[in-house]
């Protein structure tokens, strides 16, 4: 278990071919403006000498960054079994069960995945979820262990470098076993949770392949090309195949929630930049 992360020291050797302002250098290496503010005073040194943000990094210089790591407040530790599908020094991925919120929020009852993670790290941790799943969606939730990794992973996800695959149980039988849903999504109205397909929405693309059907419902594998809120649920309802049991976009089934599982996540590693693939077993079928 890796949990002794109170301060993160990051050492970078400059491979730039010319002198670079220290702030630009840090931005080039994945630090956000917020993180740079944290290390502004006394948190950066070049070749062993503490410097200010006016300093210049020359080719071959050794830059040391000290990032203070805070502990999440207000998230109590609650012991629970965790299905850890990946862990190293920089991040941890858990197969979140169905009917569990990712983190505490208004309207979300305890326990949440965040409570379990805090217990896993003995309370000495900042909860940094990179992707989030709805309460009723199961599967891979990725969390960074330090501020630098969180910034690198979040930037990578914003650049579209994450590939997320899901399995879902949807209503009806498909004529075509493979398809792409390209339909923009926006909120139904201001302040509403529900989303709809609309011409003035944000670009949203979902690719799917039918695995099998039982004559009434179908099991589909889904690849997200974008990451809009409720994208899978909205898109499959839009084409007439809502998720079975989806109370918001389909037909409510008493004492049953929809089946949607994130079973694969592919991404560049925040430190090595090598592409890794994380998988989590799906517990449901037709």
Name each model-derived stretch.
Residues 2-180, 186:
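RNA pseudouridine synthases
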Residues 52-56, 221, 257:
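Short, surface-exposed secondary-structure edge patches
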Residues 48-50, 209, 215-223:
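Short histidine-centered loop motifs in beta-beta connectors
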């Amino acid at each position: 278990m890796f949990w002794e992360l109170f301060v993160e020291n990051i050492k970078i050797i400059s491979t730039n071919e010319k002198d670079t302002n220290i702030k630009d250098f840090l931005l080039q290496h994945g630090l956000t403006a917020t993180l740079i503010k944290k290390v502004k005073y006394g948190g950066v040194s070049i070749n062993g000498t503490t410097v200010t943000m006016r300093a210049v990094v020359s080719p071959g210089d050794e830059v040391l960054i000290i990032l203070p790591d805070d502990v999440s407040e207000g998230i109590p530790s609650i012991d629970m079994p965790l299905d850890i599908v990946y862990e190293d020094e920089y991040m941890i991925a858990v197969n979140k069960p169905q009917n569990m919120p990712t983190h505490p929020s208004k309207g979300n009852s305890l326990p949440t995945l965040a409570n379990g993670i805090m217990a896993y790290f003995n309370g000495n941790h900042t909860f940094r979820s990179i992707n989030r799943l709805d309460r009723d969606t199961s599967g891979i939730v990725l969390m960074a262990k330090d501020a630098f990794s969180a910034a690198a992973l979040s930037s990578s996800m914003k650049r579209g470098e994450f590939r997320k695959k899901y399995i879902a149980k949807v209503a009806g039988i498909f004529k075509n076993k493979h398809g792409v849903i390209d339909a923009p999504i926006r909120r139904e109205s201001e302040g509403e949770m529900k989303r709809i397909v609309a011409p003035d929405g944000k670009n949203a693309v979902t690719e799917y392949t039918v695995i099998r059907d039982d004559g009434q419902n179908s099991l589909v594998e889904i690849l997200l090309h974008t990451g809009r809120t409720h994208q899978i649920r909205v898109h499959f309802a839009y084409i007439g195949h809502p998720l079975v049991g989806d109370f918001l976009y389909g037909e409510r089934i008493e004492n049953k929630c929809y089946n949607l599982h994130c079973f694969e996540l592919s991404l560049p590693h925040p430190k090595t930049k090598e592409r890794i693939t994380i998988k989590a077993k799906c517990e449901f079928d037709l």
